[in-house]
Amino acid sequence: MTSATASTSPADRTTAPKPFSLRDATPADVPAIHAIYAHHVLHGRASFEEVPPTLDDMQRRFAEVQCKGLPYLVAEREGEVLGYAYASSYRTRSAYRFAIEDSIYIDHRRVGEGLGQALLAELIARCETGPWRQMVAVIACTAGGEGAGSLAVHERLGFRTVGRLEAAGFKHGQWIDTVLMQRVLGAGANTLPE
């Protein structure tokens, strides 16, 4: 378990930062993960799903990540799941087996507390101990600035922009671009895989 402290804005510095911890997700966390994701599906544009998956669907997705040996993390404070992050296969074809994609979702009431950056940093650290060589982020961005925070967090943690698909999605009455970012894990392409 990793401990971190929530960031605070200048106006909030009169109160002590609220610590949160990062840990491996368990099946017991899936209902909270489902609630966080369902909110983003219904009200946001980060996910291109338009109908929230069922709890059974989320349990199956969780199990698939775990069966592949990929990390699935939650941030929690006093037993409450505040956000989650996981790595999944970037694509299903076998030549992509050393490339993974990150996904991070934060409870909409907790955005701006440093959870996303802490989760991503821990996810990267975990993935660098595995066989994977590249991490890809697929980030939804709108003309109104949605996605800018995720782009900034990824950039701070070593990702670089490698492409942009313009107007690749349409959700909640707005066109959405997809920005592709990439980060080397471990030796990257400098050595052949074992």
Where are these regions (language model features)?
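Acetyl-CoA-dependent GNAT
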Residues: 24, 52-109, 120-121, 126, ...
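A short, internal acetyl-CoA/4′-phosphopantetheine-binding micro-motif in the GNAT/acyltransferase core
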Residues: 103-112, 139-143
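Conserved acetyl-CoA-binding loop-helix of GNAT-fold acetyltransferases
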Residues: 112-127, 148-156
